[in-house]
UniProtKB/Swiss-Prot annotation:
Native organism: Prochlorococcus marinus (strain AS9601)
GO biological process terms held by the UniProt record: co-translational protein modification; translation
Name this protein carries in UniProt: Peptide deformylase
Family membership noted in the UniProt record: Belongs to the polypeptide deformylase family.
Species classification: Bacteria, Bacillati, Cyanobacteriota, Cyanophyceae, Synechococcales
Region annotated Disordered, chain positions: 1-21
Annotated keywords: Hydrolase, Iron, Metal-binding, Protein biosynthesis
InterPro entries: Peptide_deformylase, Peptide_deformylase_sf
Length: 201
């Protein structure tokens, strides 16, 4: 396992399956992933009132697209659907590890310890910057069968969940970056406009 969020997001060596979808994908993602500057990324998502086969199909397609793009997390708004749905797999090098499908996730507790870690995003390709977040969280959600679940998360998983949940509220990780010089430099290098960042610090 790599030491940085961005390194993990760049690596996808495995021969396993996840939700019957090969973790190693090649070519263009199955679904188009919206980029910084697209309005859909700034909208609040709506709760899913019924977990049915259409939601499970969407989750499978999101996983396929996430693996193809060599990511470790994807939120529905990133593919233009403003619903509270996330897919995450921080262990995609482990063929036996199952991905997480989080429906209507809600963080119920944040740990008091904060740490800074490098993040990247499939909606802002090529940009990797440090973001400060709580290192542990507790959350509740529904799984792909609609069953209520609770879990604790720490480390990379906790960070990835927080990162993807931000998307449900129209927030991107660049909005949380405190070093504006580094932010503007990275955005310019990758062809993004700093005016599309909405700082929340």
């Amino acid at each position: 396992m790599a030491n940085h969020f961005s390194q993990l997001a760049k690596k996808s060596r495995t021969n396993g399956n996840a939700e019957k979808i090969a973790k190693e994908q090649s070519g263009k993602p199955f679904l188009d992933i919206y980029k910084l500057g697209d309005d859909v990324l700034r909208q609040n998502s709506k709760r899913i009132t019924k977990v049915d086969e259409s939601i499970r199909k969407l989750a499978r397609e999101m996983l396929q697209s996430m693996y193809a793009a060599k990511g470790i997390g994807l939120a529905a708004p990133q593919i233009g659907i403003n619903k509270e749905l996330l897919v995450i797999d921080v262990n995609f090098e482990d063929s036996a590890a199952e991905p997480l499908i989080l429906i209507n996730p809600e963080i119920t507790d944040f740990g008091t310890t904060l740490n800074s870690y490098e993040e990247g995003c499939l909606s802002i390709p090529g940009v990797y910057l440090n973001v400060v977040r709580p290192s542990t969280i507790k959350l509740k959600f529904r799984d792909e069968m609609g069953r209520p679940r609770k879990m604790k998360a720490d480390g990379l998983l906790a960070r990835c969940i927080q990162h993807e949940m931000d998307h449900l509220n129209g927030i991107l990780f660049v909005d949380r970056v405190t070093s504006k010089d580094d932010l503007n430099k990275e955005l310019l290098k990758e062809g993004f406009n700093e005016k599309d960042v909405i700082s929340i610090n």
